A protein has these predicted regions:
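Short, charged beta-turn/beta-strand-edge "cap" motif at the junction between a beta-strand
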Residues: 56-62
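Short, acidic Gly/Pro/Ser/Thr-rich loop/turn segments
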Residues: 17-19, 95, 131
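Aromatic- and Lys/Arg-enriched surface recognition patch
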Residues: 65-126
């Protein structure tokens, strides 16, 4: 998928014990739900079809592990619900980029991922996206 100025870039966090990138690959697509933090919900409302997302495992792993694309949403989680969800599909696994690597990188060290560690839907600039891709060796894990 080619980048253009309309594409948004995000990082979504998830505990791998709850739902891992391997689970997403197995399922083929999923509804990204369970986001209740008000700032994360505000960010999720800005996500659009075609936006690119890095999948970040929280907990013990603390690393970017894969890439996703938005294929649906945002829409209400259920009738009358004020929370929104989006639908995502896997693009591919990445060679892990750890939180330690991100904190040590000059371009990424002031990113909301580092500054707001409990935020589960984190916006990214194109430069940040490209830097994480570089740190992963722009390689896909096989």
């Amino acid at each position: 998928m080619a980048s253009d100025e309309k594409t948004g870039y995000w990082l979504f966090k998830q505990e791998p014990e709850c739902y891992s990138y391997a689970d997403l690959e197995r399922d083929g697509r999923t509804i990204w739900d369970g986001v209740t933090n008000s700032l994360a919900q505000k960010n999720l409302r800005q996500v659009r079809v075609g936006d690119r997302i890095l999948f970040y495992h929280t907990g013990k792993q603390k690393a970017v592990v894969g890439e996703m694309v938005v294929v649906g949403g945002p829409r209400p989680a259920s009738d009358g619900d004020r929370h929104v969800v989006v639908e995502v599909e896997p693009v591919g696994r990445l060679l892990s980029v750890t939180l330690e690597q991100i904190k040590a990188d000059a371009l990424l060290s002031d990113w909301d991922l580092v500054r707001l560690p409990r935020l589960s839907v984190v916006p990214m600039t194109l430069a940040q996206w490209q830097r994480v891709q570089e740190l992963s060796g722009t390689g896909r894990a096989e």
